[in-house]
Amino acid sequence: MKKLKSFGGKNLSGKSMNQLQKLQEEMQKKLQEVEEGFSNVEVEVSVGGGAIKILATADRKVKDIEIDEDLLSDGETLKDLLTAGINELMEKIEKIREEEMAKVTQNLLPFGF
């Protein structure tokens, strides 16, 4: 059987290739589980001193938006606060997603990869 060169100049035998394939399949399964779990993770932001609250899940679905009635008469401020709130929410969600995905990959990758 022909050996393939891998990272660091090491040879990969058929057995090693099978192990890598199993590792890849396990990682894909774990990542899918984490992805599905994001629908159960709620993220909330509050902007404008609590005038606007936005609730979403880590799978990027907005569940609720609360707006102080006093803001409804000031369209420009409402727009600015909604924009700021949504941007802050998306940043929080991305941070959560990156951290959870990193946990999976760190736990599954063998030392040296």
Swiss-Prot record:
The keyword Disulfide bond does not apply. InterPro entries: YbaB-like_sf, YbaB/EbfC. Disulfide bonds: none annotated. GO terms for molecular function: DNA binding. GO terms for cellular component: bacterial nucleoid; cytosol. SUPFAM superfamilies: YbaB-like (SSF82607). The keyword Cytoplasm applies. Belongs to the YbaB/EbfC family. This is Nucleoid-associated protein THA_1374. It comes from Thermosipho africanus (strain TCF52B).
